[in-house]
Amino acid sequence: MKEKKDIRILAFESSCDETSTAVVKNGSEIESLVVATQIKSHARFGGVVPEVASRHHIEVITQITREALEEAKVSWEDLDAIAVTHGPGLVGALLIGINAAKAASMATGLPLIGVDHIMGHISAAQLVEPVEYPALALQVSGGHTEIALLKDPTHFEIVGDTRDDAAGEAYDKIGRVLGVNYPAGKTIDQWAHQGKDTFGFPRAMIDEDNYDFSFSGLKSAFINTCHHADQIGEKLDKYDLAASFQAAVVDVLAEKTVRAIRQYQPKTFIMGGGVAANLGLRERMNKEIAALEKAPKVILPPLKLCGDNAAMIGAAAYNQYLAGNFADLTLDADPSMELPYAEDYK
């Protein structure tokens, strides 16, 4: 019997403030992963500056492409495809990765695969262990908070979404109020473990009969509480503030997700995105799902695969490769790209 050929994909990720390249074999094995972070450059601004992000991508993308190939000990001739995030994200940042991937595809003749950034985060799970379908994914990051149902690796639908702010965005905004440098999530998580939920911040939409989220009211309640305390000269405990904020976020995410698991009965539950690195959220999701009568397999990617990285793009691209979904050199950035919603799903 003929031995199955390994499929190696060189992937690019540049949708926001991380420039990353990776070589992924068979959609599940990371042969190399290089991430050039820009956190220090953006921290003084309190958030990502698109023009600064694009300039940094330009400066490092050639070098980290070379590093990814060297780390994987492969040449261009060993590759089977080139993959790149083409949305959603910052348009200028996306274009740097897209143009690099197009140039590589044109120079080598290798097929080009465009990858949805959100599907990349979800596909990070298959770098940990095989995903059994149907699967349910909670994607929670600075730009998105969504619950997605996956019927197979390339067919999916959104069953719940945020109506306003994403959870990660709320973390960063209240971090500014607390004087925490961008990105604020890790510090707030650490503080939350040292405090108590004493402020009773709102859990918006937690009892509504849907899987949507809203975090703008929570953010406003937090800011108003802090401003009122400042006006009357009251000093609030930062650990209790962090614990109260995080409890409100985690309560809603856990309640909605567990309810969706009960309805859709997935074989696997996946959590992805930068906020998936939050230890309080990981602990709560593991506890809630383990208590279910019919619990799915739970895959929580390691912390290094929760943030933006090219390995997850390579994993998602492998699924597209097997399905024959290739792009041509007209591939363009789609900064507002969205996964299909349930009512639009075919």
UniProtKB/Swiss-Prot annotation:
Binds 1 Fe(2+) ion per subunit. This is tRNA N6-adenosine threonylcarbamoyltransferase. The lineage of its organism: Bacteria, Bacillati, Bacillota, Bacilli, Lactobacillales. Keywords: Acyltransferase, Cytoplasm, Iron, Metal-binding, Transferase, tRNA processing. It holds the Pfam family TsaD. Fe cation binds at H117, H121, D308. Signal peptide: none annotated. Substrate binds at Q139, V140, S141, G142, G143, D172, G185, D189, N278. Coiled coil: none annotated. Required for the formation of a threonylcarbamoyl group on adenosine at position 37 (t(6)A37) in tRNAs that read codons beginning with adenine. Is involved in the transfer of the threonylcarbamoyl moiety of threonylcarbamoyl-AMP (TC-AMP) to the N6 group of A37, together with TsaE and TsaB. TsaD likely plays a direct catalytic role in this reaction. Its cofactor is Fe(2+).
